[in-house]
């Protein structure tokens, strides 16, 4: 009889463990949602370099620097660089984000990736929508990113509020 009681207790604890990932609203927490979404891998964001580059800790505890695909944020000495960096930090710092690899590495050895918040938002799109980066059309031809930049520009959002914002690729050429 004692074995039956132990089995029932074990089954109850097992059931409780698997159902505890559910919130009272019936929605799953972000960990459960992440497991259902399809990403190449997940990283814990541990550092923000600028508005398009961040450091992430893999599940194997390896720290890597990533470059966000499709956007180009102001360089460190450029106007609006601090605001762009802070905006990216507010979006992803300290969070576990989903990563889809676009290309193996850029010229600095960084993996170029699409990044998704725990809620599933495309971080590159969010940076463009907020006017915190340029659409990097040299490498990305998607209509969505072009439209987001155009809308931010039209609304004078973020860096587009400046009279003459200088794209980072022009800034880099000028300041080699």
Model-derived regions: residue spans:
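Small beta-barrel nucleic-acid-binding modules, primarily SNase/OB-fold domains
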Residues: 2-176
